[in-house]
Every structure is written in C-alpha cells, then in structure tokens.
Amino acid sequence: MLLDKTIRENLDGKYLTIYGESFREGIEYAADIDIPQIQLRNNTKCNSIDFKELEKIPALKVISFVGNTTEIINLDSIYSLKDIQKIYFQQKQKFKIDISKFPNIKHIGAEYWKGLDCFNKAYGLKSIVFSKFSGLDLKQ
C-alpha cells in the first residue's frame, strides 16, 4: 500500500493514518510534518512493524490503534514517547503495555484486555474509558 499523506482531523486535532505496510515511511512523514497525532491501522498484510521507528516522533501527543496490531518488533520503544497524553485501542491487542510508563498520560480509551497493564499506577490519568470490562475491581 502506498503511503497515505492525507491529514485528517478529529476532536484531538490533526492526525495522520499510518498503515502497517507503510509504517516506516509513515513515521518518517509524521516526523517531517511534526504531526501531534497518529492512527495506526491493522498491519495484517505486512510481516512486522518495528516500534523503534516511533523514536523519530518523540513529541507525539496522541496515538490510536485501529484493528489488531500484530508482529511488533521492539515494543519497548513505545515508551520513548514521553509526551503521549492519550492512547486509544479500538480492540484488544496481542501485546502487553504498561500505561504507567507514560509520564504525561491523561486519557485511555480501550477495549479492555489483560495486557493493558498498570493503568491503576498511571497517576496522571484524568479519564479511563473501557469497553468490555468484565471485572469488578480496577486494581486487578
């Protein structure tokens, strides 16, 4: 798939949609235009995506995962995004993510899954919206 350079807008501002097949090119373009928000779309058509590329956009404020993002290399590189304020997951993911490692996180919106870890230790959170949360205790 060719790189989609269309700049869209939602309630969080302008964003770039990056597809798994053009992940590296999309991140480079996001860095070039200094966009504050990206939306990562399902990468089932590509072998893997390397989250080390995210280090090229350290000022990112909002990241959204649309679809199930699989085959991730260097997952820990996502924690280099120290300015992230909002994270959205449209559906359960196959990776584990420690929300408390984002020092400026303010909001999470997600379909809950057990890999969504330590959100109860992310003390800067102002709001959490979970769908399909079957537990009774957010401390689990």
Features from the language model and the residues they span:
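Concave beta-strand-loop units of leucine-rich repeat
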Residues: 2-28, 34-55, 59-97, 101-140
